[in-house]
Amino acid sequence: MTAKLYGIPTCDTVRKARKWLTEHGIDHQFVDVRESTPPKSQIEHWVNSLGAAKMVNKRSTTWKTMSDEDRSEAETGDTSAVLLANPTLIKRPVLEHGDVLDVGFSIDAYTQYFQQ
């Protein structure tokens, strides 16, 4: 089964996750969310499964330049619509692998997900 990793190639955390997957021989597909934004239904699934707080990247440049109204919408309103319109706000990387859905990168978590 091929894992899917969503993010942007310039993100250090995404780079670490991609490197780890490659070094451990894990078959994976990388999706650059700026070039191929996931559909709203998929983003909604992520938000519903993991929560808005975990999906919104408050360290991103996009977040820092957003109006207070847009930030409020991202936190308590239609988070999925805001992430769809601003894919660089998606906390990254997002990992999908079978029943696994996770955001961020942790060697311990990835080791558990891909026990060989």
Briefly describe each language-model feature range:
Residues M1-H24, H28-S36:
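Local sequence-structure signature of Cys/Sec-based thiol-disulfide redox active-site neighborhoods
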Residues V33-Q116:
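Thiol/selenol-based redox catalytic cores and closely related redox-interacting motifs
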